Amino acid sequence: MNIFKIFFILNYTIIFLIKIYQNTFSKLFGQQCIYKPTCSKYSIECLKKYNFLTALVLMTLRTIRCNALFKGGNDFIPKYNPISTSLKEFQKRLIK
């Protein structure tokens, strides 16, 4: 099995786990995310659009930003240079 198949399977396994989270814990506790789309939807979109490692970096940065120290609002997946764009968003949205 080559590395691309492994990452493909890993992507869809994580998507499956996120969907379980969305249908259980998210419904129990309500939406707490300060962004649109929510962090779980953002993560699914990242996993579908980018390779596993890029998606992992984007999901991690987004999850770290989802708290009271950052400005919420619309935050869509970057179309170009996803990691550098996400890092710029990280700095831009930090409440100083």
Curated annotation (Swiss-Prot):
Keywords, comma-separated and alphabetical: Cell inner membrane, Cell membrane, Membrane
Lineage of the species this protein comes from: Bacteria, Pseudomonadati, Spirochaetota, Spirochaetia, Spirochaetales
Protein name: Putative membrane protein insertion efficiency factor
Intracellular or extracellular location(s): Cell inner membrane
NCBIfam families: membrane protein insertion efficiency factor YidD
Keyword 4Fe-4S found: no
Bilayer-crossing regions: none
Domain of life where this protein originates: Bacteria
HAMAP family the UniProt entry points to: UPF0161_YidD (MF_00386)
Primary location class: membrane
Cellular component per GO, a single term: plasma membrane
